UniProtKB/Swiss-Prot annotation:
GO biological process: adaptive immune response; B cell differentiation; chromosome organization; DNA recombination; double-strand break repair; double-strand break repair via nonhomologous end joining; interstrand cross-link repair; response to ionizing radiation
Alphabetized CDD domains for the sequence: artemis-SNM1C-like_MBL-fold (cd16297)
Phosphoserine PTM positions: 385, 650
EC primary class: hydrolase
Name under which the protein is recorded: Protein artemis
InterPro entries: DRMBL, RibonucZ/Hydroxyglut_hydro
Length: 698
């Protein structure tokens, strides 16, 4: 049952299949087919008055619908106001407002609907877009793709809205047998019955006046028996149908509807009152085409179901099934879709919930994928690559891990290093101290994690003000460095598989000197080098030195103590082989000194390097000697001690278990006696050093 109110949103001056109330003001009327639920108000007195007062209002329909409509005397007043439009023929219609003279042009195309004889769909094209009104229709899957007038340029036209027949838009009617399947079932049953004897008769219990002509014509053609109907007036202009119908009651197939007298039911069940000439009872079966009855079944059934002793149900539908509606709507894909019928037991909202996902308006409303964009940036704090320490609000429990490039080339010649002049502030400002080059930009190299961390800006270290001031007279004398000297980069020591020359081996600290372990240790971040004031002295704790090879600061808490480190620069070779240490300074003569940045980063030696130098015979190089500065707040006693050239032998003794320094002379007995005396009394051995910082190694 149609619930369409007659007007479309895009073209409100047109009324379709509804001719009462507000539709009386329409400029044009359209009728899709001749079923009563689509003809409300068509013969009402108000419509007659409307036609009498207007000369430019017409009813548009198909030629068959016009013939069927005018066969009834009740619609004779429409005879001069009906305009038949041929199927699949685009026709321009003028919509004129007689009061104002306003005129609107639309192009109307009639498409076959497959519902009943003369039923059509209306395709409107005008200034407000393309709109399709289906009326009642039954189209099999894929049939819409063969409608050429729904296509333009090889694809479906851009349809704004579809007003759709949703009679069976219910999952209960997901699949309805096609008309061909129903015809085969009915044909088999009828043939098996009427061939028994002339007294065996079939009655087709059809409730509608139109729509079953498909069954009538096909049964008559297959069995050679005409179908009896009440009247033929409506089909007089349709010879294809008229040929298979008759008003003669003496036939075995009947589709008559209304009895003329009660007596006709005494000897038979036929409405027309047909009886046997011998007054014997006829053997009659009834077949009722229906769809709703099958939709209510909970189990799958056959196309023909026996419901009584002589009654049957045939699944025959004038309307598209649930799956056929979905196929139709998915193919044309309109912007909007509106239901013309509300199925029994459903609501408008439920029907719309089914239609919306098949429309473009719903597809456009769905959230589309797009990158987080500003949303992501709003929730993320972008930090500079050198501001890793600011990632967390709380202090780090462990030292941050620096990233250093590992794909570097090892150049052995960089181990031979000269002292830096004072006129190069970007490389070094403190005498006896050498700084490495700035790290390459992190974005230009691959990285590995380094356990050591220096300052937040490793590539832009500045000399502390305490070192830029006047240097005391006790500082180490500087060499006259070559201005073109190449300063080594500390990252070259991370290359493991390159060849290392003997000259490189001479400049590497031994594993015993570094605490007997080759694994790097964590150190506290030291943002400044040489921050201790002039006059500070270094000392060796006698308590620790008597039990281990560790060099510690008084007041420190192990290896996590914050101590500044520097590397002592070497004297010129021309200065002689002096190995004595005066009151103020200690001047060893190594071949070359190692870069301070190497010590700061506690870099691992290459794999080919002989790090465990346990005797002076294996390696003859003399590495730099490094000592820690005092970290405690108080200054050490001004006691000064000098080491003789026999220090290497004393370190290799059983008391210390430290191998002798390569190329170092043995300390003199008087120096050893002085040291042993200090150790025996538990006093601290203090070496006066100013503006010098040492790196602590295990």
């Amino acid at each position: 049952m149609s619930s369409f109110q007659g007007q479309m949103e895009e073209y409100p001056t047109i009324s379709i299949d509804r001719f009462d109330r507000e539709n009386l003001k329409a400029r044009a009327y359209f009728l899709s087919h001749c079923h009563k639920d689509h003809m409300k108000g068509l013969r009402a007195p108000s419509m007659k008055r409307r036609l009498e007062c207007s000369l430019k209002v017409f009813l548009y329909c198909s030629p068959v619908t016009k013939e069927l409509l005018l066969t009834s005397p009740k619609y004779k007043f429409w005879e001069n106001r009906i305009i038949a439009i041929e199927i699949e023929t685009p026709t321009q219609v003028s919509l004129v407002d007689e009061a104002s003279g306003e005129k609107e042009e639309v192009v109307v195309t009639l498409l076959p609907a497959g519902h009943c004889p003369g039923s059509v769909m209306f395709l409107f094209q005008g200034s407000n877009g393309t709109v399709l009104y289906t009326g009642d229709f039954r189209l099999a899957k894929g049939e819409v793709s063969r409608m050429e007038l729904l296509h333009s340029g090889g694809r479906v036209k851009d349809i704004q809205s579809v007003y759709l027949d949703t009679t069976f838009c219910d999952p209960r009617f997901y699949q309805i047998p096609s008309r061909e399947e129903c015809l085969r079932g009915v044909l088999e049953l009828v043939r098996s019955w009427i061939t028994r004897s002339p007294k065996h008769v079939v009655w087709l219990n059809c409730k509608a006046a139109y729509g079953y002509e498909y069954l009538f014509t096909n049964l008559s053609e297959e069995l050679g028996v005409q179908v009896h109907v009440d009247k033929l007036d409506m089909f007089k202009n349709m010879p294809d149908i008229l040929h298979h119908l008759t008003t003669d009651r003496n036939t075995q197939i009947h589709a008559c509807r209304h009895p003329k007298a009660e007596e006709y039911f005494q000897w038979n069940k036929l409405p027309c009152g047909m009886a046997s000439k011998t007054k014997t009872v006829l053997h009659t079966i009834s077949i009722k085409p229906s769809t709703m009855w099958f939709g209510e079944r909970t189990r799958k059934t056959n196309v023909i179901v026996r419901t009584g002793e002589s009654s049957y149900r045939a699944c025959f539908s004038f309307h598209s099934s649930y799956s056929e509606i979905k196929d139709f709507l998915s193919y044309i894909c309109p912007v909007n879709a509106y239901p013309n019928v509300i199925p029994i037991g459903l609501t408008v909202d439920k029907v719309m919930d089914f239609l919306k996902p098949l429309c473009r308006s719903s597809q456009c409303a769905e959230p589309k994928y797009k990158p987080l964009g500003k949303l992501k940036r709003a929730r993320t704090v972008h930090l500079d690559s050198e501001e890793d320490d600011d990632l967390f609000d709380d202090p780090l429990l462990t030292h941050s891990r620096r990233k250093v490039p590992y794909q570097v080339t090892l150049h052995p010649e960089v181990f031979s290093m000269k002292a830096l002049p004072l006129d190069q502030p970007e490389l070094g400002q403190s005498p006896g101290c050498c700084k490495a080059e700035s790290m390459p930009s992190p974005s230009l190299a691959n990285f590995v994690d380094c356990d050591e961390s220096n300052s937040d800006s490793e590539g832009e270290l500045e000399t502390p003000p305490s070192l830029q001031g006047g240097l005391g007279p006790t500082t180490l004398p500087q060499q006259n460095a070559d201005p073109d000297v190449d300063v080594p980069r500390w990252e070259v020591f991370f290359k493991r598989k390159d060849e290392i020359t003997d000259e490189c081996l001479e400049n590497l600290p031994s594993s015993i000197e570094t605490g007997g372990s080759q694994s790097p240790k964590r150190f506290s971040d030291s943002p400044k080098l040489g921050s201790d004031s002039d006059g500070e002295s270094t000392h060796i704790s006698s308590q620790n030195s008597s039990q281990s090879t560790h060099i510690t600061d008084q007041g420190s808490q192990g290896w996590d103590s914050q101590c500044d480190t520097v590397l002592l620069s070497s004297q010129e070779k021309s200065g002689g082989d002096s190995t004595s240490l005066n009151k103020d300074t200690y001047k060893p003569k190594p071949k070359d000194s190692i870069s301070a940045s190497q010590i700061e980063q506690n870099a691992l030696c290459p794999q080919d390097t002989h790090c465990d130098l346990k005797s002076g015979a294996e390696v003859n190089g003399v590495p730099c000697i490094e000592e820690p500065d005092t970290v405690s707040g108080r200054k050490s006693s001004p006691e000064k001690t000098s080491l003789t050239s026999t220090q290497a032998d004393s370190q290799s003794s059983s008391d210390f278990e430290i191998p002798s320094t390569p190329e170092a002379e043995l300390p003199k007995p008087e120096h050893l006696q002085f040291l042993y005396g200090k150790l025996a009394t538990g006093e601290s051995i203090v070496l006066k050093k100013e503006n010098v910082h040492s790196q602590i190694f295990k």
